[in-house]
From Swiss-Prot:
Residues 238-275 are annotated as: Disordered. Residues 73-206 form the Thioredoxin domain. Disulfide bonds join 129-132. InterPro entries: Thioredoxin-like_sf (IPR036249), Thioredoxin_domain (IPR013766). One of its GO terms (cellular component) is chloroplast. It comes from the Eukaryota. This is Thioredoxin-like 1-1, chloroplastic. It holds the Pfam family Thioredoxin. It is found in: Plastid, Chloroplast.
Length: 275
């Protein structure tokens, strides 16, 4: 018994010798004498590190399961947030090759000017407009059925100032442009009145040749866009042709020359002959 107590004291002394500031450990000590022999492996405790031990030749890790669950939950939340942030917007779904979004007033003007004789449909929409969202799949179908027609999308929320200068105050709103005619029609419609859109495509969609240059936006609209200080757009108004003044009539117009009057002798002769 005395031997066991002394060995226990040695065991505790060994523990004291291996104590450090950031951990504590127990050195392996063997007990014997009573037919019982066990070995205690070194046990270490460190801040924010899992506990490790050796049990029958296998390594056992003691960790905080709550921390692990928290890390997994945080990773799942971050992945979910990333997926939501990169979700495709409704006005970007189903787009065709002849559909694109306008990013500036200059791009809108250039797109209409360079369209030539092609029919151009300008679609004014807003992300928060329920009617615009419901109508979008139909517009994509029309674009697919009419590959020769150019569809331009204008986001009202991103280009409010430009839409105000163009006089757009209702959504969804559409403008049709064609060659030298410029704007051929404009209207607002929903799924209930989609016939307006279908009829406009049928009327202005067939191929035709313009006799003049492509018009695009009207002169007053271009001037309004240039006057808008919030837009990075410049435009030089076309010179107004001066009408030629009408020729003023002469103050002394030429009058016909009167016939010479007959002399008194001739009159007497005629009277005498009559007698």
């Amino acid at each position: 018994m005395t031997e066991v107590i002394s060995k226990t004291s040695l065991f505790l002394g060994a523990c004291g010798n291996h104590h450090r500031v950031d951990d504590f450990s127990f050195s392996p000590v063997s007990f014997g004498g009573f037919g019982l022999k066990k070995s205690f492996s070194c046990l270490k405790l460190k801040s924010q590190k899992p506990l490790r031990s050796v049990f029958y030749g296998k390594q056992i890790v003691f960790g905080d399961s709550q921390d692990e669950s928290f890390r997994r939950s945080s990773a799942i939340t971050a992945q979910t947030t990333l997926r939501i942030g990169t979700a495709q917007k409704w006005w970007e779904k189903g787009l065709k090759d002849n559909m694109r979004e306008i990013s500036s007033a200059q791009e809108l003007v250039d797109s209409l000017t360079n369209a030539g004789d092609k029919l151009v449909v300008v679609d004014f929409f807003s992300p928060g407009c329920g009617g615009c969202k419901a109508l979008h799949p139909k517009i994509c179908q029309f674009a697919e059925m009419n590959p020769d027609v150019q569809f331009l999308q204008v986001n009202y929320e991103e280009h409010k100032s430009m839409c105000y200068s163009l006089g757009v105050h209702v959504l969804p709103f559409f403008r049709f442009y064609r060659g030298s005619q410029g704007r051929v029609c404009s209207f607002s419609c929903t799924n209930a009145t989609i016939k307006k859109f279908r009829d406009a495509l049928a009327k202005h969609g067939p191929d035709r040749c313009s006799l003049g240059p492509t018009k695009g936006l009207e002169e007053k609209e271009l001037v309004a866009l240039a006057a808008n200080k919030e837009l990075n757009f410049t435009y030089t108004p076309k010179p107004v042709p001066v009408e030629k003044e009408a020729a003023t009539p002469d103050s002394n117009p030429s009058l016909p020359v009167p016939l010479p009057s007959m002399s008194s002798n001739d009159e007497k002769t005629l009277v005498s002959a009559g007698r």
